A protein has these predicted regions:
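Conserved DEDDh/DEDDy metal-dependent 3′-5′ exonuclease domain
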Residues: 142-234
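Acidic, Mg2+-coordinating catalytic module of metal-dependent nucleases/exonucleases
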Residues: 222, 226-296
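N-terminal accessory regions of nucleic-acid-interacting proteins
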Residues: 1-110, 305
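Residue at a conserved register position within TPR or TPR-like alpha-solenoid repeats
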Residues: 309, 364, 402-403, 440
Length: 471
């Protein structure tokens, strides 16, 4: 393409009068890459966007000392179906199980829960990333789901938007996000810091449901552990016509450049669905950790629940691990040992059974129930296809148990030798050989007679004992 043609095309893209607009999918994903007269920070779109925003999105302006913000408020009725569940049921579960939040996060999270999700100008985070749409949601007393979405109408409106968002955050007993500890919270805190405003996020207990969701339900082989994948799997919800995440920044840049809010309508709907799915997923998690092991549907859920309890010091961890073993055994009897690939192996019933046995043995040992722990270690040693590292750990634990607690040196020697067979490498092998040498010394001592007879002293009652016999 010759320079003249390229120059004309670029002028068409950035024409402030709206000529030569391009499709949103062809827009660059970063405003810094747009040539021409992109709106600079502090340049307000003013009345050019006001009527369009209110007409397309149906929101309102809120003015504060720091500036004003455009807010779109929606109410989703409790009887509205979302996937297999009604919205009001999410609120009821959260209300009944809110104490379970303390098992998933530190800082004493409590209700009311504020569900929080950002749409940003980039996916990399950092100081140059702006949160142009801040979604906040909660359940009201009637079980309806309320959403407030705050739009940064241009870069100069960010300070006003942040001041209004802070009012929502100040009312929260806990902040609930999906990957928010790694992305949403750092992004919004950076923007508060940039404007020299106090960040309310740092003062609120934060429940990030991504990490427990990974433990409980794993990753879909195609969709991974995204919110969309989990809402399909757990809530039965499917989105129709949803805007792809990679396209969202480009739609915002088009709005800033042209003042046309129509491309943002789908972005707002995408954000609302994210908030609703986040609420449904949180309700499912809290109900699970509150009701206990009996409510788990499969061995993976039970194992993850045991780890949540163990991390929180909850005594129900033992029952959860027992439940995981029970469900894994049932799945193995049904022929559920197949796996998609090696990385996925520990998610199979066989892999979960091994992990649950190991976790249970460690839990019992910490409770000083050494005999019960030894039973679980022995089950691991005898289990076919047990990973080498876990088998080695189990044989070593059994050698220690029989040497120091059962005082069965022969059994201790046997398990030490088994441990050496599993892992003879230098670091491990040296420790095992040291243990074997000690056991051998103890065995030699135990084989000596307690009161050995002296050759110079005949035994009592012999003819040469010095006593005459009567004739």
């Amino acid at each position: 393409m010759d320079p003249g043609t390229l120059r004309n095309r670029l002028r068409g893209i950035v024409d402030p009068r709206g000529k030569g607009q391009v499709n949103s999918t062809s827009l660059p994903a970063d405003p810094a890459t747009v040539p021409g007269d992109e709106l600079a920070p502090g340049h307000s779109t003013g009345s050019r966007t006001g009527s369009t925003l209110e007409h397309v999105l149906g929101g309102e302006w809120r003015s504060r000392d720091q500036g004003r913000s455009f807010v779109v408020r929606r109410r989703i009725d409790p009887d509205t179906a979302y996937g297999r569940t009604r919205v009001g049921e999410f609120g009821s579960r959260l209300s009944e199980a809110q104490d379970g939040a303390s098992l998933l996060a530190t800082g004493g999270p409590r209700g009311p829960f504020l569900f929080f999700d950002l749409e940003t100008t980039g996916l990399s985070g950092g100081a140059g990333t702006h949160a142009f749409l801040v979604g906040c949601a909660w359940f009201d007393a009637d079980g309806a789901f309320l959403t407030e979405q705050h739009l940064m109408t241009d870069y100069g409106a960010e300070r006003g938007m942040l001041s209004v968002v802070a009012e929502d955050l100040a009312q929260a007993g806990a902040l609930v996000t999906f990957n928010g500890k790694s992305f949403d919270a750092p992004v919004i805190e950076t923007r508060y810091l940039f404007h020299r405003l106090s960040s309310p996020c740092s003062q609120i207990p934060h429940v990030d449901v991504l990490h427990p969701a990974r433990r409980f339900w794993g990753a879909d082989p195609v969709l991974g552990c995204s919110l969309v994948a989990l809402e399909r799997q757990l809530l039965g919800a499917r989105r129709v016509g949803d805007v792809p995440g990679f396209e969202i920044p480009a739609r915002y840049f088009q709005f800033v450049r042209t003042g046309d809010a129509q491309p943002l309508a789908d972005v707002f709907e995408h954000n609302r669905l994210d908030l609703l799915s986040l609420a449904g997923l949180t309700a499912r998690l809290l109900a699970l950790v509150t009701t206990g092991p009996a409510s788990t549907h499969d061995e993976r859920e039970a194992l993850a629940l045991g780890r949540v309890y163990e991390r929180a010091g909850d005594p129900r961890a033992e029952a959860a691990y027992e439940r995981a073993i029970e469900l894994a055994d049932a799945a193995l009897q049904r022929g559920g040992q197949k796996r998609r690939n090696e990385a996925d192996w520990m998610s199979t019933p066989q892999g979960v059974r091994i992990e649950a046995l190991r976790a249970l043995a460690l839990t019992l040992r910490r409770a000083r129930r050494f005999g019960d722990a030894a039973v679980r270690w022995r089950q691991l040693v005898d289990f076919p296809n047990c990973p080498q590292q876990i088998r080695r750990e189990s044989t070593e634990a059994l050698a220690i148990h029989h040497e120091h607690r059962e005082r069965d040196l022969a059994a201790a020697k046997m398990f030490a030798l088994k441990s050496l067979e599993v892992g003879p490498e230098t670091a491990w092998g040296d420790a095992v050989r040291h243990r074997l040498a000690r056991i051998e010394r103890k065995l030699k001592v135990s084989e000596r007679p307690l009161f050995p007879s002296s050759p110079s002293q005949p035994s009592c009652g012999s003819p040469t004992s010095g006593h005459r016999t009567s004739s």
